[in-house]
A protein has these predicted regions:
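A compositional/biophysical signature of low hydrophobicity enriched in polar/charged and small residues
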Residues: 1-80
Length: 80
């Protein structure tokens, strides 16, 4: 399992709509946080090993209504 974080910039006034649509329609999303700064949302996803991250982001995240831009962070190791 691979953990991927996606920062999402939304069109004005669309943050809550994007978050609600994403959590309801994209099954690989674990959590969504609203954030301050350049991006409006931080989405935590768990993808299967070997799954094409680019296709996932392109097909599932960037196509959500109200998404303006994304920035993807690929993780290596979780420390606890």
């Amino acid at each position: 399992m691979q953990t991927v974080f996606v920062q999402v910039k939304c069109k004005l006034g669309q943050v809550y709509n994007v978050a609600e649509e994403a959590i309801e329609t994209v099954e690989k999303i674990s959590e969504i946080y609203s954030t301050s700064g350049q991006y409006d949302l931080l989405i935590k996803c768990y993808l299967n090993d070997g799954e094409d991250i680019g296709h996932f982001i392109n097909d599932k995240i960037q196509t959500l209504s109200g998404v303006k831009d994304t920035y993807t962070l690929i993780t290596f190791k979780a420390f606890s």
